[in-house]
Amino acid sequence: MYDKKEDYRKSHMGASKPKEYDPQFWIPGATNHLFWQIERQILLDIMDCLKPRPKRALDFACGTGRVLSFLEGHVPETVGVDISGDMLKLARHRCQRSQIIEGDVTTNPDLLTGKFDLITAFRFFLNAQPELRQNVLAALRRVLADEGILVANFHLNPKSITGSYLRFRHWLKGSNRAMMSLKEAKDLLESSGYKPVEIRGYGYLFHRRKQVRFLRLRGPLEKALAKINPYPEVALNFIVAARLR
């Protein structure tokens, strides 16, 4: 967890960051590996509902190219942008045909050209400071097509079972941990000129460790709950699809 007093832009700088960050999504049995499997299906579901299908997609804060490499298989033209050159080294190796841009969209409005039918932003808004969140959403708004869609992921809901446990644990320690509820996420998007049109929750069970206990039982159950999408307000993670207002 980065120091909240620092600018979040600095949080993924450094040659060691890709090795620290990336493996958790690819190790079978890891909690984030399970969540990434679910996220891929949610992305597919959202894209399948778009008419016409997206022809040009941007993955904002693409990091090591996890989401971007997935989009390559489903969208004709894909672009990734990130401020961390260290993370992008792995993204360039992983992504076969995407245009990958290093830079800050909040300070360089000419960094991105043209409009995008689909923009994804995963694992960014939770830890970014409020001003940076607003500035990023404004920058993305400029390049989102009129009928395009923004798909944003939020990965630590305080109203979930796991979130409630973590809040209590940090309270005992006298510390804080960044969290964002579904209402807070919707308010953030709406205040920046977006209208949420679909919400998908996942991570309904209690997850205390980085590895999923009883994976053969809990893995399929988590996937089934994500498909049913009963109460995204109490899921650990959620994805919000939003259009321009």
Regions inferred by a protein language model and the residue ranges of each:
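A C-terminal cap/extension of S-adenosyl-L-methionine-dependent methyltransferases
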Residues: R167, E198-R245
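A conserved beta-strand element that flanks and buttresses the S-adenosyl-L-methionine
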Residues: T120
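A short glycine-rich, Lys/Arg-flanked "PGG" loop and its adjoining helix->strand segment in the class I
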Residues: Q134-D146
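Class I SAM-dependent methyltransferase SAM/SAH-binding core
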Residues: T64-T107
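Conserved class I S-adenosyl-L-methionine
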Residues: M1-K51, P54-A61, V151-K173
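Acceptor-substrate binding/catalytic loop of class I
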Residues: F168-E184
